[in-house]
């Protein structure tokens, strides 16, 4: 069984995986000819890495979207907490990164340039268990967000 495949794309060879890092829960958008990716960083700070690529093969990190989490409890290690599965969007000349903190709610940070600077986190919905945001803007300009729910964040870990 091969773990890594050599692949050819437009005459260019590359080897999977193309990123030798743990970028959990990635979300990727395309703006023009550029691709941008964000990923979970949990309680590691700075947090929420933002990467850039023009070909989905070669990536470089541009920024960290979060300098500090807005709760004192994150000043200490907290396994399983912090930023989970962020979502990156581009709308009306602005980059948005929606960041769930599953014990606190959904937060957003914005920047005109993906390299930053990124705004301080702003809570858009205080909630327990909200994860995996999927925001979008409708044709009428209204913004909406679908999300998942982690029941384990509300005191139920397992049922036997």
Q: Where are the regions that the model predicts?
A:
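Carbohydrate-active catalytic/glycan-binding domains of CAZyme proteins
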Residues: 1-160
